[in-house]
UniProtKB/Swiss-Prot annotation:
Domain EngA-type G, first and last residues per copy: 3-167, 182-355
Binding residues annotated for GTP 2, in chain numbering: 188-195, 235-239, 300-303
Organism this protein belongs to: Delftia acidovorans (strain DSM 14801 / SPH-1)
GO molecular function list: GTP binding; ribosome binding
Entry annotated with the keyword GTP-binding: yes
Function: GTPase that plays an essential role in the late steps of ribosome biogenesis.
Protein family: Belongs to the TRAFAC class TrmE-Era-EngA-EngB-Septin-like GTPase superfamily. EngA (Der) GTPase family.
Name used for this protein in its record: GTPase Der
PANTHER family in the cross-refs: GTPASE DER
């Protein structure tokens, strides 16, 4: 599982700027979840081989007792509880405050790994103006400038170094997956019906479930079998033990959702027909796409809406989730057990598509046929020339195309190629990534 880093500190010390640096973005992939918009933002980043999740929090006053400040304190405490390491941000220019002392006292009491960061330290003599922060009792002070990117790499080295992370395993992209269980995550916002659907499945299959071994950061996974196909159901709804089996309860955790999506082979994205497509649905869908996971859409509570509402909902899905056009969509009622059979078929089909093997001769033939049908547009004196294609990975499938001047290939032409490949290999329910590798000889592709 990806380690989780929480940024805490009093208001206006530069946490959000640092967050944007750590995620290399001005808007995290998963941000502004409903009910958390002013308090917690979630994003992801990478340092070398290690990926991580970052939580940005509102200004923290541990002892706040009323109003918005109490809610912000509660949200920050939740972020700290979710985190593996805390980055405590102070303002190097304004110096230490009573609030900093209160936050440090709270963090010392928790005993969680912590990195003390003095932001806005650009142009300051190192060590001279930061001495007072040693009084906080959290060890060395790391000067950084989030605005200029100074010290950010050192910050990540310190934060991740405290966790003794193992080297990420190099997965064989062509490992035989036929005999492995399909890892399935049911994702969706709170009260969309995840727990009802999971409990329906568990009840149907009369499962004996158990915790899989792993670290405390691991999501619970429940192994089960259906029609001869083995699955592992990865928890996002909050599975609790009931005797020798699990039942699901509604318990929404952004971090758990992100980690469960990362751990999955296939994500079943559940949408509430009575609520329509919300911003939160779109954010989760965006994270699924960015993670490269196979995905199936299921619109739950379909029996609770009339024909007009159904038409409007279908249009909304086509518009707001247009980037998931490749995903099969089902209309179900988890409570009444309607539409669940075809849903299983699509889950298996999506996994098959995500892990299919595409021979180089077939890919190259398809590429040549596509080029013959529609030649890439010429840009200036250069025209992209495509030579051959091969598979570069699975789950999601990656097709690598080699040639000359491929940097001039338009996004529209890439979509054209994607459509041809999808049709040939029946790639339903999975993202498809196309990588272009061009010759570095600037004269190789000039039109004479």
């Amino acid at each position: 599982m990806k380690p989780v880093i929480a940024l805490v500190g009093r208001p206006n010390v530069g946490k959000s700027t640092l967050f944007n640096r750590l995620t290399k973005s001005r808007d995290a992939i998963v941000a502004d979840f409903a009910g958390l918009t002013r308090d917690r933002h979630y994003g992801q980043g990478r340092q070398g081989k290690h990926e991580y999740i970052v939580i940005d929090t509102g200004g923290f006053e541990p002892d706040a007792s009323s109003g918005i400040f109490k809610e912000m304190a509660r949200q920050t405490q939740q972020a700290v509880a979710e985190a593996d390491v805390v980055v405590f941000v102070v303002d190097a220019r304004l110096g230490m405050s009573a609030q900093d002392h209160d936050i440090a006292k709270y963090l010392r009491r928790l005993g969680k790994p912590c990195v003390l960061v003095a932001n806005k330290a650009e142009g300051m003599k190192e060590g001279v103006q930061l001495t007072e922060f040693y009084e906080l009792g959290l060890g060395d002070v790391l000067p950084v400038s989030a605005a200029h990117g100074q010290g950010v790499r050192d910050l990540l080295d310190l934060a991740l170094g405290q966790l003794n992370l193992p080297e990420p395993e190099e997965d064989d992209p062509f490992d035989d997956v036929a005999q492995k269980p399909i890892r399935l995550t049911v994702a969706g916002r709170p009260n969309v019906g995840k727990s009802t659907l999971i409990n329906t499945w568990l009840g149907e299959e009369r499962l004996v479930a158990f915790d899989m071994p792993g670290t405390t950061r691991d999501a619970i996974s429940v192994p089960f079998e259906r029609a001869g196909q083995k699955f592992e159901l990865i928890d996002t709804a909050g599975l609790r033990r009931k005797g020798r089996v699990f039942e699901a309860i509604e318990k929404f955790s952004v971090v758990k959702t992100l980690q469960a999506i990362e751990s999955a082979n296939v994500v079943l994205l559940l949408i509430d027909a009575t609520q329509g497509v919300t911003d939160q649905d779109a954010h989760i869908a965006g994270y699924v796409l960015e993670s490269g996971r196979a995905v199936v859409l299921a619109v739950n509570k379909w029996d609770a809406v009339d024909d007009y509402q159904r038409q409007m909902l279908e249009r909304s899905i086509e518009t707001r989730l247009s980037f998931l056009k490749f995903a099969p969509m089902h209309f179900i009622s988890a409570e009444k057990r309607q539409g669940l059979g075809p849903l299983w078929n699509s889950i298996i089909q999506a996994h098959k598509a995500a892990t299919c093997k595409m021979p180089t001769p077939v890919l190259t033939r398809l590429l040549m046929e596509a080029v013959q049908f529609q030649t890439p547009k010429k840009t200036g004196i250069y025209r992209p020339k495509m030579r051959y294609a091969h598979q570069g990975g699975m789950n999601p499938p990656v097709i690598v195309i080699h040639g000359n001047s491929l940097e001039h290939v338009t996004e529209a032409y890439k979509r054209f190629l994607e459509g041809r490949f999808r049709k040939e290999f029946n790639l339903v329910g999975t993202p498809l990534r196309i990588e272009l590798k061009t010759s570095h000889n600037p004269f190789a592709d000039k039109d004479k």
